[in-house]
């Protein structure tokens, strides 16, 4: 089956893991994603309804605009994908415009340009909330028109919310399945490449996410979580059934060092016996 790509480039995007995720994702009517990111899982599953959330307000605003003003958005965005916009001076001018822009539609148009022309598809903000990714110097950035239209069509059955993982998981009911793709736990003390947004994700929040998953499955709502395979994640997810998969990281400081690493898919499934928490 053909896989559908997201229209955004995204750190930690789940496109490479789709087959593994779909293999372990339980059936249900509604998929709840508290960390929707670029939406690869949403775009490649067939639930009747979707509740898609993220803490990044720019991302959720963009998705609602693509859903509701598709043709207008595609036309406006296409105008920025020109040879004359593929230069550092123009990129930094448009980045500055984005950081001062108050108009949601124009901001969404600029967001796609910055995503495709910026370095490595990163979405990163400084402590003042300003987008600060440098120019990417790509030969000819791709304009994802087909991907935008596919997203917009699929989004007619989705609701997008800018809110915390706890609030979006609270929306799940007995007809729901929850898939969580949190900013990954560090592999080591120096591996802290998880603060893609100004709200970085703490170890306390990682543990809290697992607690919410335990509460949901006790109410017969299944939860699947992806994360690095570490001693900490195995401790957090000790009540889940763990599946190990290998994946090559999509983003690294050095493209030549993107070696495959072990990741966990932690499945909290109603009715499946799990060991007691230690």
From Swiss-Prot:
GO biological process: DNA replication; DNA restriction-modification system; methylation; mismatch repair
Keywords: DNA replication, DNA-binding, Methyltransferase, S-adenosyl-L-methionine, Transferase
Catalytic activity: a 2'-deoxyadenosine in DNA + S-adenosyl-L-methionine = an N(6)-methyl-2'-deoxyadenosine in DNA + S-adenosyl-L-homocysteine + H(+)
Keyword Metal-binding: no
UniProt-annotated binding residues for S-adenosyl-L-methionine: 10, 14, 54, 181
InterPro entries: Ade_MeTrfase_dom_2 (IPR023095), DNA_methylase_N6_adenine_CS (IPR002052), M_m6A_EcoRV (IPR012263), MeTrfase_D12 (IPR012327), SAM-dependent_MTases_sf (IPR029063)
Disruption phenotype: Cells are more sensitive to mutagenic agents.
A Pfam match: MethyltransfD12
Domain of life per record: Bacteria
Keyword S-adenosyl-L-methionine: yes
EC number(s) stated in the UniProt entry for this protein: 2.1.1.72
GO molecular function, one term: site-specific DNA-methyltransferase (adenine-specific) activity
Family (UniProt): Belongs to the N(4)/N(6)-methyltransferase family.
Role this protein plays: May be involved in methyl-directed DNA mismatch repair, initiation of chromosome replication and gene expression.
Protein name: DNA adenine methylase
Originating organism: Salmonella typhimurium
Gene transcribed to yield this protein: dam
């Amino acid at each position: 089956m053909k896989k559908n790509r997201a229209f955004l480039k995204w750190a930690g995007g789940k496109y490479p893991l789709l087959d593994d995720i779909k293999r372990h994702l339980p059936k249900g009517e509604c998929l709840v994603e508290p960390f929707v990111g670029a939406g690869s899982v949403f775009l490649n599953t067939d639930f009747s309804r979707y509740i898609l959330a993220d803490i990044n307000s720019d991302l959720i605003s963009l998705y609602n605009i693509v859903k509701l003003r598709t043709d207008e958005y595609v036309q406006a965005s296409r105008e920025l994908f020109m040879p004359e916009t593929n230069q550092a001076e123009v990129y930094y001018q448009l980045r500055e415009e984005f950081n001062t822009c108050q108009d949601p539609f124009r901001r969404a148009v600029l967001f796609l340009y910055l995503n495709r022309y910026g370095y490595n598809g990163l979405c990163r903000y400084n402590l003042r909330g300003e987008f600060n990714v440098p120019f990417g110097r790509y030969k000819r950035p791709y304009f994802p028109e087909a991907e935008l239209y596919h997203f917009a069509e699929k989004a007619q059955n989705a609701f997008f919310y800018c809110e915390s993982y706890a609030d979006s998981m609270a929306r799940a009911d007995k007809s729901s399945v929850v898939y969580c793709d949190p900013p990954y736990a560090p592999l080591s003390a120096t591996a802290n490449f998880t603060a893609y947004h100004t709200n970085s994700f703490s170890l306390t929040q990682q543990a809290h996410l697992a607690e919410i998953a335990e509460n949901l499955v006790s109410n017969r709502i299944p939860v699947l979580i992806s994360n690095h395979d570490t001693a900490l994640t195995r401790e957090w997810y000790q009540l889940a059934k763990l599946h190990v998969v290998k994946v090559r990281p999509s983003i690294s400081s050095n493209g030549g060092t993107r070696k495959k690493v072990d990741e966990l898919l932690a499945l909290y499934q109603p009715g499946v016996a799990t060991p007691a928490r230690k």
